[in-house]
UniProtKB/Swiss-Prot annotation:
Protein's gene: gpmI
Protein name: 2,3-bisphosphoglycerate-independent phosphoglycerate mutase
The reaction(s) this protein catalyses: (2R)-2-phosphoglycerate = (2R)-3-phosphoglycerate
Species in which this protein is naturally found: Rhodopseudomonas palustris (strain ATCC BAA-98 / CGA009)
Binding positions (substrate): 124, 153-154, 183, 189, 254-257, 330
EC numbers: 5.4.2.12
Active site feature: 63 (phosphoserine intermediate)
Subunit structure: Monomer.
Amino acid sequence: MQSRRPVMLVILDGWGWREDPADNAVLQAKTPTFDALWTNGPHAFLRTSGKSVGLPNGQMGNSEVGHLNIGAGRVVMQDLPRISDAIANGEIERAPGLVAFIDKLKASGGTCHLMGLVSPGGVHSLQDHACALAKILAKAGVKTVLHAFTDGRDTPPKSAVDDIVRLRAELPPNVPIATVSGRYYAMDRDNRWERVSKAYGVIADADGPRFADANAVIADGYAAGVNDEFIVPAVIGDYQGMRDGDGVLCFNFRADRVREILAALLDSAFAGFPRKQVKQIAAAAGMTQYSTALDALMGTIFPPQSLVNGLGQVVADAGLHQLRMAETEKYPHVTYFLNGGEEVPYPGEDRIMVPSPKVATYDLQPEMSAPELGDKAVAAIESGKYDLIVLNFANPDMVGHTGSLPAAIKAVETVDTQLGHIVAAIRKAGGALLVTADHGNCEMMRDPETGGPHTAHTTNPVPVLLVGDNGPLADGQLSDLAPTLLKLMELPQPAEMTGKSLIG
């Protein structure tokens, strides 16, 4: 006899809905579990982009935004429009974090090393934000250089040349591009220090291949068959590296992929790889809060918003037990982001992280660690210990980002198999299960405009399925999931949660 009725949310990361089967890994894959749930049980669609998740109209969602909205149970105004609005109305110039950064650099006389993802993608950054900061720094008389990370993941794989041309046109003439690094190197998040060290080398020590300008770096990469994401870090012109008294300003607003490079640049105790000489940094700031560890080393221009009474807090306050599960790639999303930016687990909250496979790109192993994660999920359900389980399967998103349709099909099929095991365990335990996604990706594997691989997220709706309750389900948005889970758990919905239960 189960001591607790488990209620579970399974997030099929990157599993969007598109009716056309062409270049659609979701529809081309064999998915008997999903198909049976869709045919025989309550189902609906959720909006995961634009204003439905606190982003600008037409802006695709992403995992960070998605999990924030899921956990908060309300539409969370995202950093992208929040920052853009502050730039448009001039408020950013008065932001205490930026004012303090500029004052420190003026006092030290050092150079500002402005860095981040040069991309119109709007997932990790917006290059317009970089240009706005560069103009503010130039106006303040602070010498500034820019370290450009190229995208090709949230944007078409060969779009960096156009991005750099637009960047140069907007940057003040006295702000040069000092280095160029593909995000594969500069924005790792899985402790692959052999990659990060190459980006660090060009930024800190000007140690790497040298080119006359940024476009020459990209052209050299293309000639070698290397797309934007994988551009080998390079030095531009006569850049000589960082010096004592310099400052670091990161314009990415998403936290997870800047933590490693910033730790290497700022943390005197960093041990990921040997550094030639640790520079004495006079000032450091980030567009948003990146982590508790980095808080001790840098300021924040846009501090986090308070998100009280989210899903995790409500469950904990009721004295219930919850479990968060994912492999490495999506572990921060089911913990930190789902908890509204809180890193410390709530009382009664357990966490399981299964290591992601150590491969260069996930098309080489589209199964990733889903089988192990699925086994652990079944064991958790059968344990009778948990009232709420939240699990993320990373495969459809992470393999979708590679642009390989055959690999994405395999990823979807792998996840469907594991979902089958979970459904059986939930039914046996007398529990309830919601299955959905945080955004689309692998349902669109070819770019209709360029004809090339489509590696970015989409603005398509995502399916939502219900097991163990008769429903019916209404269409909605991600912020409606927490109220739905609370209803299944027979817990009251707090006033701060403005989402609506999907169950009629």
